């Protein structure tokens, strides 16, 4: 594959793939009580393969093995229970396991650091989700917790003519915090004129996580944990809502992704004078008023 870069060479490339199979899903549910359900789900998933925009001719050449990547598939197992307790607390709890076969993983090429997807051998995700909702007087509350662990179950090997280990077995998959918590409170009251007012406070927390699968310090960075809080007050009637809100009350930076300057910044030696380094951050503190009217 070649492509025009700095006006050099034609843009060409052709790769085909054709796959056909059947995906299965089985769900079983049992109600031991009227307000309680147990369930189990087994399902399969598939994602097609593709090609990377990696040059193999002309300038900035990479090996041809970095161009195509194959499909991947998953087997998902999930067990859970949901219902309502005697104190009117709604709950939804589940545990799950996802086995990845030939997982498509984001990497970079060795010569000029082009973005490239390659196939690993095996990966696995395990976790649990807990959701609770209830009321105490005029206060409605909700609580959520998620635990997630995702890692490689075999070394990730590059598709080069002389393969090398890009990430070792046991390496955690990027972009997946192990712990996430959300809490919400809402207090509702009514005025003599028929209008109501509801005050809300919400909090979200996530633990630290990796931004990149590579073990190279030029790419990999452990992103800090963060907590984001929102508050709002809404005056409402049957056909109108007036809300005052503050999002990200503490103005938390909340970095969820990063392209480090060491690898994505200027590199005059390679003829690159621009910069592609950046961070993905949470919405900064935002204060506002919204008005809705139904007609």
Language-model regions, residue ranges each:
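Outer-membrane beta-barrel translocator domains and adjoining extracellular loop/strand segments
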Residues: 1-2, 51-58, 103-111, 148, ...
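Residue-level signature of outer-membrane beta-barrel architecture
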Residues: 28-31, 44, 71, 81-83, ...
């Amino acid at each position: 594959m070649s492509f025009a870069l700095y006006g050099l060479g034609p843009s060409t490339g052709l790769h085909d793939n054709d796959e056909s199979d059947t995906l299965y899903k089985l769900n079983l549910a049992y109600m031991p009580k009227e307000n309680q359900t147990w369930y189990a789900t087994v399902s399969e998933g598939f994602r097609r393969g593709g090609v990377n925009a990696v040059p193999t001719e002309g300038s900035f050449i990479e090996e041809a093995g970095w161009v195509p990547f194959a499909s991947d598939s998953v087997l998902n197992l999930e067990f859970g229970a949901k219902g309502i307790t005697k104190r009117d607390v709604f709950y939804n709890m589940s545990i799950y396991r996802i086995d990845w076969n030939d997982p498509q993983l984001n990497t970079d090429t060795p010569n000029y650091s082009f973005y490239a997807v390659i196939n690993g051998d095996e990966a696995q995700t395990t976790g649990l989700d807990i959701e609770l909702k209830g009321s105490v007087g005029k206060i409605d509350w909700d609580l959520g917790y998620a635990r997630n662990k995702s890692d490689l179950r075999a070394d990730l090997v590059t598709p080069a003519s002389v393969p090398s280990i890009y990430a070792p077995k046991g390496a955690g998959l990027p972009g997946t915090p192990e712990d996430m918590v959300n809490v919400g409170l809402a207090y509702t009251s009514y005025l003599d004129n028929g209008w109501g007012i509801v005050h809300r406070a919400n909090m979200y927390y996530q633990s630290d996580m990796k931004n990149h699968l590579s073990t190279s310090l030029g790419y990999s960075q452990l992103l800090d944990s963060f907590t984001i809080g929102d508050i709002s007050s809404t005056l409402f009637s049957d056909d109108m809502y007036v809300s005052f809100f503050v999002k990200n009350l503490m103005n938390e930076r909340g970095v969820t992704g990063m392209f480090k300057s060491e690898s994505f910044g200027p590199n005059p030696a390679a003829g690159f004078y621009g910069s592609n380094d950046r961070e993905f951050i949470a919405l900064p503190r935002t204060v506002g008023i919204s008005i809705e009217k139904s007609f």
